[in-house]
Each structure stands twice: as structure tokens, then as C-alpha cells.
Amino acid sequence: MRPALFLCPVLISVLFLLSSLSLISGCNKALCASDVSKCLLQGLCQCRPQEGNCSCCKECMLCLSSLWEECCDCVGMCNPRSYNDSPATSKSTVEELYRPIPSLFRALTEGDAPINMMVVSFPVAEELSHHENLVSFLETLDSQSQNISLPTSSAQDDALCTVVYFDDCVSIRQCKQYCESMGGSKYRWFHNACCECIGPECLDYGSKTVKCMNCLI
């Protein structure tokens, strides 16, 4: 009985905090609810930095891991942000996938788009014409990979870059897993939690425009 009695106040406080997530400015409830509830249940994010108590800040940051930047608002631990800060949709993280399967990606993106996804194709030349402005990378890119030149042959000029957007918001871990399961070559995860899987014909990192139907903000 004692463990149950001990857990009741914790569960009540967690449920109260989760119910108020959508009221917290900047809190992405769709992305953060699961991880935040896990960390709260472990008692790792329950101190109050705004009241001068940051005794749990380090443990909370480690618990939220790669979602810290996106979810710290949900636990009241983000530094105050300027209204002039760039929106999350303008920031993204990219990574090359270890074992792409081009034939699988093409098969899944030809014809009608799968449920809960949107397939977009555009010229490779258009993909390479934009200067990348990424906030972070999951891997180190050497100087040569950052200075990509436009293709010169007419065949490459006519090539299309095909990408897939998932309709709903997902975590960066889910984004990587989904794109790997589709045989994608790379992925781009926008900091508003929109996921873009990038096909084998793309020479850079696809489009830097958010087009996830239910995850546009």
C-alpha cells in the first residue's frame, strides 16, 4: 500500500502538468508530452528555476536528451526568448543514413502517396540553388561537402529530387527510423517536429520548406 500511496501525489502532479502543457507558450505538446511525462514521473524535472531552484536542471536536460531545446518550455526551464528569434520552421537538423535502399524508396514514392505522407518532387538544380542555413548537424561535414557545385550535364539538370513529408509531428528519433525504413538516403528534421525523408536522386538535403500537413507551426 505504501508505494501506491507515495505514487498518487506524483501521478496527480504529473497529470496536472500535462493537462497544462497546451497553455504554456512555446510548448509543443504533440512532440513533447510523452518524454516530458516520463521525466516528470522519474522526478527529474520538478524543480522551479524561475523561483531560484535549479537543483534538477541538469538531470532534466539529460532526461529530455535531444528534445531539450524543443521541450524545455514544457517544464519551465527554457531561457527567456526574444520575440525576434527565428521560428522553429526555419531551423533543421540533417543526417545521412547509413544504408539507403534506393529501389525501396522509389517503389514507395511512385504512384499514389502512402497514407499520412506527402510526396514532393522538384528539380535538383532548385535544391542546390538555396544556401543552407542549418542550426545544427548530427554529423561533421567537411569543407568539400559544404561547397556543392551545380551539375553540368543536361541529364543532371533534368533530374528530380523526391522527398517525403509525414503529415504529423514526430521526434527526431522517429524521423530517422521512419526514413531508414523507407530506404531514404538522408533526412531533415525541422525544429517544429516536421520530418522530411530525402531520396537517392537528391544531391543535397532536399527542401528546407516545412510541408507537413498537421505540423506547420
Curated annotation (Swiss-Prot):
Extent of the signal sequence: 1-26
Biological-process GO terms, alphabetical: blood vessel development; regulation of BMP signaling pathway
A GO term from the CC aspect: extracellular space
Compartmental location: Secreted
Domain of life from the UniProt record: Eukaryota
Positions annotated with a glycan in the UniProt record: 53, 147
Transcription as UniProt keyword: no
Disulfide-linked positions: none
Keyword Cell wall biogenesis/degradation: no
Keyword line: Developmental protein, Glycoprotein, Secreted, Signal
InterPro entries (alphabetical): Tsg
Cited function: Involved in dorsal-ventral patterning. Appears to function predominantly as a ventralizing factor, through its actions as a BMP signaling agonist, acting through both chd-dependent and chd-independent mechanisms. May also antagonize BMP signaling, probably via formation of ternary complexes with chd and BMPs, resulting in dorsalization.
Stated family: Belongs to the twisted gastrulation protein family.
Protein's name in the database: Twisted gastrulation protein homolog 1-A
Taxonomic lineage: Eukaryota, Metazoa, Chordata, Craniata, Vertebrata
Gene of this entry: twsg1a
